[in-house]
Amino acid sequence: MANSKTAKKRAIQSEKRRQHNASRRSMLRTYVKKVIAAIKTGDHKAATEAFAVAQPIVDRMATKGLIHKNKAARQKARLNARIKALAA
């Protein structure tokens, strides 16, 4: 347990941030899963639409520092490659 007043405050702030980030991370994963589900069904149009919704969210989470910018780029590139493979 925190001993000083500032340590207690920092513990409270840390817990608030943890919960907020957990919510955002869950939202990010949900949107990525929607794209993957659309890809697995083989529907190119649905996958493209889901990717168009997920792409700015992935970028936003990278900007906020929730995920690394390289991870965001990697996720988008891999999803886009899978969508393009559907069209071929």
Swiss-Prot record:
Instruction: List the GO terms this entry assigns under cellular component, sorted alphabetically.
Output: cytosol; small ribosomal subunit
Tell me the segments the record calls region Disordered: 1-27
Q: Which GO terms describe its molecular function?
A: small ribosomal subunit rRNA binding; structural constituent of ribosome
Q: Which InterPro entries match?
A: Ribosomal_bS20, Ribosomal_bS20_sf
Q: Does the keyword Phosphoprotein apply?
A: no
Superkingdom: Bacteria
The record's Pfam families line, in alphabetical order, gives:
Ribosomal_S20p (PF01649)
Biological process (GO) annotations held by this record are:
translation
Keyword annotations from UniProtKB, A to Z? Ribonucleoprotein, Ribosomal protein, RNA-binding, rRNA-binding
Q: Which NCBIfam families match?
A: S20
Q: Which family does it belong to?
A: Belongs to the bacterial ribosomal protein bS20 family.
Function (record text): Binds directly to 16S ribosomal RNA.
The identity of this protein, by name, is Small ribosomal subunit protein bS20
Q: Which organism is it from?
A: Shewanella amazonensis (strain ATCC BAA-1098 / SB2B)
